[in-house]
């Protein structure tokens, strides 16, 4: 879906289906955040008795014969002194939902007086564009009759005429092509999004962008590389596993390389340690880490960032069956480290472990960042609005946190408590794949950290179990797959690595 973007002054704007008018909240009452004609004030003045201008508040009104737009949306931005990028992002996401429900296809968005805010026009426009694009999206459905909302087709920002506005919107569109790819993959039936499908998507990206190369390992090649942990998880599945390696060379003269790893469990039944039905019903989303990496590569190649990045996706189902891997058995990873299986439902860390080992052997990484819907414990800890992350490097952790703050994709650093590491002890192997029934997210991260062995590489593990998929709309995300992480990581790489 291509969303047309333009800019105009108030007097020279074209007709549109709707106009979005901004308001501050002052002393619990709505205050105009921009100057408009008296004809518009006549439309909304009576509505202000029930509209306070608080963050994300909207009121839907109809215009009259004297207004260019026949539908008017009042949008609250909250107190002007408290407005943040996240405020703007969520407010315009909410406005987009209102506009689409009203079947608007063209919209004029009047900017507030930005001089009253603590940040720049560029920052405001970036978050406005992200808010609109985030909810100008329909998840795949399977109804006989299409019930999805119509898309916005044209947005005109009123009150500024500048080259920077068009540049910002084009950049955000490239970013959201990656976000939409991530969402679509997570939202689509698990029977369709198999490991082979993920491999096909990676091949498609490499075909679209000359800057991308792809390498696909099948089961035979996986076994040849001695990835015994990935091979173990794949044993019970009717679909074949794939190990996907994407390579982006944006700066051939640099030795700096970021490796992004995404957990690609295309459906997680729990294996022989079978999940209850209620816990299994959303498990097509267990490949959200893989989808995030693919979305990042789509945006990365489109934006042509001058950095070097490798993406690794270990992809398999975790199925129940007579050949499925078994609890109590021991399997050996790529580097020879052995793992006793305490639970077949702790499979994500196994396939990530082989991916980390592969990255260290072949990619010479400066840093490794992995994405995984890894633990229910993280959802219990931080809910669905914040992803927990672990890092062995303070600079990497600081930079990720800053990128998180600036994009509104909330990350919270969690501790790597070495005191908990003995919980992974096994009498018959180098380690177990689960700890005790406490600190589950931490022991999962400690498990992954062991596969770094003595390598000093900077590493971060993002547990996106809560943030990747929402069963109800939560601004600025739609219902179901969110695409969380794509914008944050692109911003991180652009700000801190593109030098």
From Swiss-Prot:
The keyword ATP-binding does not apply. Binds 2 manganese ions per subunit. The active site is at 275, 349. It is found in: Cytoplasm. Mn(2+) 2 binds at residues 263, 268, 286, 347. Transmembrane segments: none annotated. InterPro entries: Leucine_aapep/pepB (IPR011356), Macro_dom-like (IPR043472), Peptidase_M17_C (IPR000819), Peptidase_M17_leu_NH2_pept (IPR023042), Peptidase_M17_N (IPR008283). Keywords: Aminopeptidase, Cytoplasm, Hydrolase, Manganese, Metal-binding, Protease. GO terms for molecular function: manganese ion binding; metalloaminopeptidase activity. It catalyses: Release of an N-terminal amino acid, Xaa-|-Yaa-, in which Xaa is preferably Leu, but may be other amino acids including Pro although not Arg or Lys, and Yaa may be Pro. Amino acid amides and methyl esters are also readily hydrolyzed, but rates on arylamides are exceedingly low; Release of an N-terminal amino acid, preferentially leucine, but not glutamic or aspartic acids. Pfam families: Peptidase_M17, Peptidase_M17_N. One of its GO terms (cellular component) is cytoplasm. It is an enzyme of class 3 (hydrolase). Mn(2+) 1 binds at residues 268, 345, 347. Its EC number is 3.4.11.1, 3.4.11.10. The keyword NAD does not apply. GO terms for biological process: proteolysis. Its cofactor is Mn(2+). Its main location: cytoplasm. Presumably involved in the processing and regular turnover of intracellular proteins. Catalyzes the removal of unsubstituted N-terminal amino acids from various peptides. Belongs to the peptidase M17 family. HAMAP family: Cytosol_peptidase_M17. This is Probable cytosol aminopeptidase. It comes from Chlamydia trachomatis serovar A (strain ATCC VR-571B / DSM 19440 / HAR-13).
């Amino acid at each position: 879906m291509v969303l047309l973007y333009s800019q105009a002054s108030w007097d020279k704007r074209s007709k549109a289906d709707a106009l979005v008018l901004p308001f501050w909240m002052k002393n619990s009452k709505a205050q105009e955040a921009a100057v408009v004609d008296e004809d518009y004030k006549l439309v909304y003045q009576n509505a202000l008795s029930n509209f306070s201008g608080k963050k994300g508040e909207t009121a839907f009104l109809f215009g009259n014969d004297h207004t260019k737009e026949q539908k008017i949306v009042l949008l609250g931005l909250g107190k002007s002194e408290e407005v943040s990028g996240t405020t703007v992002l969520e407010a315009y996401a909410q406005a987009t939902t209102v506009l689409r429900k009203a079947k608007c296809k063209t919209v004029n968005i009047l900017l507030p007086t930005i001089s009253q805010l603590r940040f720049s026009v560029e920052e405001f426009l970036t978050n406005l564009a992200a808010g609109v694009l985030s909810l100008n999206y329909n998840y795949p459905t399977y109804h006989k009759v299409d019930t999805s909302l119509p898309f916005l087709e044209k947005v005109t920002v009123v009150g500024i005429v500048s080259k920077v506005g068009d540049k910002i919107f084009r950049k955000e569109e490239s970013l959201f092509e990656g976000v939409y790819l991530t969402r679509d993959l997570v939202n689509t039936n698990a029977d369709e999004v198999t490991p082979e499908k993920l491999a096909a998507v990676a091949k498609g990206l490499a075909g679209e962008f000359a800057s991308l190369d792809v390498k696909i390992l099948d089961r035979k090649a996986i076994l040849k590389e001695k990835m015994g942990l990935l091979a173990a998880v794949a044993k019970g599945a009717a679909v074949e596993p794939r190990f996907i390696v994407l390579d982006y060379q944006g700066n051939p003269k640099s030795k700096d390389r970021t490796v992004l790893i995404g957990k690609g469990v295309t459906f997680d039944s729990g294996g022989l340690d079978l999940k209850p039905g209620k816990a299994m019903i959303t498990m097509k989303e267990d490949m959200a880490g893989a989808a995030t990496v693919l979305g990042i590569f789509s945006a990365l190649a489109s934006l042509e960032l001058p950095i070097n990045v490798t993406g690794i996706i270990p992809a398999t189902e975790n199925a129940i069956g007579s050949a499925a891997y078994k609890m109590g058995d021991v399997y050996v990873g790529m580097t020879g480290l052995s793992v006793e299986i305490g639970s077949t439902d702790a499979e994500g860390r196994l396939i990530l472990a082989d991916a980390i080992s592969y990255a260290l052997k072949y990619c010479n990484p400066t840093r490794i960042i992995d994405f995984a819907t890894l633990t229910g414990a993280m959802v219990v800890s931080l809910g669905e609005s914040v992803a927990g992350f672990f890092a062995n490097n303070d600079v990497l952790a600081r930079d990720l946190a800053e990128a998180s703050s600036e994009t509104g994709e909330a990350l919270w650093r969690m501790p790597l408590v070495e005191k908990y590491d003995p919980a992974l002890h096994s009498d018959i192997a180098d380690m177990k794949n689960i700890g005790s029934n406490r600190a589950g997210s931490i022991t999962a991260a400690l498990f992954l950290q062991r596969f770094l062995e003595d390598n000093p590489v900077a590493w971060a593990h993002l547990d996106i179990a809560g943030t990747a998929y929402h069963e109800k709309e939560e601004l600025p995300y739609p219902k179901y797959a969110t695409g969380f992480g794509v914008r944050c990581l692109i911003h991180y790489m652009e700000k801190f690595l593109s030098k």
